[in-house]
């Protein structure tokens, strides 16, 4: 690995397709259910009308929050500049390794979107929280590998203990062994 190399952590096309099917596909199915109800083509029209309407709105909301994943912005989730003076950055935000206090990929309470999607949450030493959206199109092991290989060696001791404390010894040794045998980055 060269000093100051840029590593791109990219999304998985399979997960992008599932997000599209789950939001747009189910939205169309619910719209069809609503249509069946309002044209009285089913004897359950009293259930089909409100259920179709509500679930169509729900799926439309899901499609809207997943929409950036279907654009070129969803190709690369974040980039890592390696080395001692490295940083995690996207087109909008940048955090140096020395400023990271805690890094994790989890659901959050900062918005309604956090109920449905995991984001990369970086807490800095000056108590700011930086959120990098993932739209659930990056698998957790890929994120773990990026942190373990390129970020963790350059973090301060508190950040290292926060990262390692998220996992049991068995979990961590299992995924470290997997990264050695089958690297994805």
Curated annotation (Swiss-Prot):
Cellular component terms (Gene Ontology): plasma membrane
Segment forming the signal sequence: 1-29
Topology relative to the membrane: Lipid-anchor
Pfam families named among the record's database cross-references: DUF5381
Protein name, UniProt field: Uncharacterized lipoprotein YfjD
Keyword Ribonucleoprotein assigned: no
Residues with a covalently attached lipid (S-diacylglycerol cysteine): 30
N-palmitoyl cysteine lipid modification positions: 30
Family membership noted in the UniProt record: To B.subtilis YfjE.
Compartments where located: Cell membrane
Organism: Bacillus subtilis (strain 168)
Transmembrane segments annotated in the record for this chain: 45-67
Domain of life: Bacteria
Keywords: Cell membrane, Lipoprotein, Membrane, Palmitate, Signal, Transmembrane, Transmembrane helix
């Amino acid at each position: 690995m060269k000093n100051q190399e840029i590593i791109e952590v990219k999304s998985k096309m399979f997960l992008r397709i599932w997000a599209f099917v789950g939001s747009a596909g189910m939205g169309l199915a619910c719209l069809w259910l609503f249509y069946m109800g309002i044209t009285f083509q089913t004897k359950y029209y009293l259930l089909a009308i409100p259920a179709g309407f509500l679930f169509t709105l729900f799926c439309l909301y899901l499609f809207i929050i997943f929409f950036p994943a279907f654009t070129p912005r969803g190709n690369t989730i974040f980039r890592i500049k390696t080395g001692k003076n490295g940083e995690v950055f996207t087109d909008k935000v940048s955090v140096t390794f020395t400023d990271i206090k805690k890094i994790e990929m989890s659901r959050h309470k900062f918005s309604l979107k956090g109920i449905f999607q995991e984001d990369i949450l970086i807490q800095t030493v000056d108590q700011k929280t930086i959120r990098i959206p993932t739209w659930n199109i990056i698998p957790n092991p890929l994120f773990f590998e990026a942190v373990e290989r390129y970020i963790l060696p350059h973090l301060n001791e508190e950040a290292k203990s926060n990262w390692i404390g998220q996992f049991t010894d068995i979990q961590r040794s299992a995924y470290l062994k997997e990264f050695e045998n089958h690297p994805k980055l």
